[in-house]
């Protein structure tokens, strides 16, 4: 298994799909990384040479991924909480932040739902 950005990349998957195992890299960014590294998208990770894996590491290193990205997101939410702005209040109250309706939906954000509503009475 290749190790990129502190994550073991599954070597039985295609390069584009395998890179999405890294937090912060989706399919579009993965395609851009493969194109910049000069790697075909349909090549599996185990078929790559060590030089190609090093190129992938260099390209992934240009982005904020994994722990750094998680830390950045957490700090952004903490900043909103400290400011006391509307979005910060919504985070504090565990309500939807981006204007979604709460009269009917948003149950997963409002309360932890372990079972569906219909199975409660049974």
From Swiss-Prot:
Function according to Swiss-Prot or TrEMBL: Located at the top of the head of the 30S subunit, it contacts several helices of the 16S rRNA. In the 70S ribosome it contacts the 23S rRNA (bridge B1a) and protein L5 of the 50S subunit (bridge B1b), connecting the 2 subunits; these bridges are implicated in subunit movement. Contacts the tRNAs in the A and P-sites.
Keyword Calcium: no
InterPro entries: Rbsml_uS13_C, Ribosomal_uS13, Ribosomal_uS13-like_H2TH, Ribosomal_uS13_bac-type, Ribosomal_uS13_CS
HAMAP family (UniProt xref): Ribosomal_uS13
SUPFAM superfamilies membership: S13-like H2TH domain (SSF46946)
Pfam family, one: Ribosomal_S13
Gene3D superfamilies associated with the record: 1.10.8.50, 30s ribosomal protein s13, domain 2
Molecular function GO terms recorded: rRNA binding; structural constituent of ribosome; tRNA binding
Region (Disordered): 94-122
Domain of life: Bacteria
Gene Ontology annotations for the cellular component aspect, listed alphabetically: cytosol; small ribosomal subunit
Alphabetical GO biological process terms: translation
Complex and partners: Part of the 30S ribosomal subunit. Forms a loose heterodimer with protein S19. Forms two bridges to the 50S subunit in the 70S ribosome.
Stated name of the protein: Small ribosomal subunit protein uS13
Family (UniProt): Belongs to the universal ribosomal protein uS13 family.
Key words of the record: Ribonucleoprotein, Ribosomal protein, RNA-binding, rRNA-binding, tRNA-binding
Coiled coil: none
Keyword Membrane on entry: no
